Amino acid sequence: MNPHSAATTFKPRFPLMKKFSLYLMIALYVLAGANHFYNTHFYEAIMPAYIGYHQLLIYVSGVCEIILGLLLIPNYTRKIAAVLISIMLIVFLWLHIQMLIDFWKNNDKHLWIAIVRIPVQFVLIWWAYSFARIPVSKGIK
């Protein structure tokens, strides 16, 4: 393998921006996860009726978000955390689609939030995955 290949010479184009982006993502998932414990009623309202154990699933997803957010901190766990966050967001996408359908059927005044949330979810998936593509040995300086 060429020692000067892209995999061995990775350098973020904007290292300060990438670092800020990482810290922002860590804060986002830790705070969002904590919010699952403080505002459970918000999450219960958007959970599909056909899924049971709403309270338990809200707490479990909150714990997952906190743990995955914290796993973004060490360089050696960042890649797997980013991949798992991407997968988690893909799983959550179907909940947001169901919320959109329910809001549409019920002519909910918050339909616009459900509409905006879908493309935002794709941005969040891309954002998380962008940290999965950084070679672990290089990290973010």
Where do the protein language model's features map onto the residues?
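Membrane-interface extramembranous regions
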Residues: 2-141
